[in-house]
């Protein structure tokens, strides 16, 4: 099977990976959850080429995880905001980060600490 065909299979995992399985996509989504919205913010944070970033953002917009919202008319400039579909990926990213903290830390420093907005207590994502 070719990678282009993965999204056409009857497997939910494969269809999800067709959208999210690229090496930059989850990092772009992570940055969205951290409050980034603008192209230049993503590029400065990730160090990805403009062409690759534009492609990944377009794919996320096309898939429905992000929406492109104008914030300046001349020259035209856009922000990328999470949609309901995109927001639903938050627990997935938290679980992936938790897995990485547990299995891949290798003494590189303290993991990110998550704080519940409503009560202010620290928490660890669990499944």
Positions of predicted regions on the chain:
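Extended, folded domain segments that form the structural surfaces/walls around functional sites
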Residues: 29, 37-42, 57, 92, ...
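N-terminal intrinsically disordered/low-complexity leader segments
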Residues: 1-8
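Basic, amphipathic "hinge/linker" alpha-helix immediately C-terminal to the N-terminal HTH DNA-binding motif
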Residues: 21, 72-95
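C-terminal regulatory/oligomerization modules of transcriptional regulators
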Residues: 94, 98-127
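N-terminal helix-turn-helix DNA-binding core of bacterial DNA-binding proteins
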Residues: 11-49
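Generic leucine side-chain signal with a strong bias for well-ordered alpha-helical environments
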Residues: 17-20, 26-27, 53, 57-60, ...
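Canonical helix-turn-helix DNA-binding module
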Residues: 39, 43-71
């Amino acid at each position: 099977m070719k990678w282009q065909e993965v999204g056409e299979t009857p497997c939910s995992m494969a269809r999800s990976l067709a959208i999210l399985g690229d090496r930059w996509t989850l990092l772009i989504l992570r940055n969205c959850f951290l409050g980034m919205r603008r192209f230049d913010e993503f590029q400065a944070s990730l160090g990805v080429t403009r062409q690759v970033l534009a492609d990944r953002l377009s794919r996320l917009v096309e898939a429905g995880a992000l929406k492109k919202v104008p914030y300046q008319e001349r020259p035209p400039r856009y922000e990328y905001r999470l949609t309901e579909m995109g927001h639903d990926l938050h627990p997935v990213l938290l679980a992936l980060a938790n897995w990485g903290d547990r299995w891949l830390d290798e003494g590189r420093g303290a993991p990110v600490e998550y704080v519940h907005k409503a009560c202010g207590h620290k928490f660890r994502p669990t499944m």
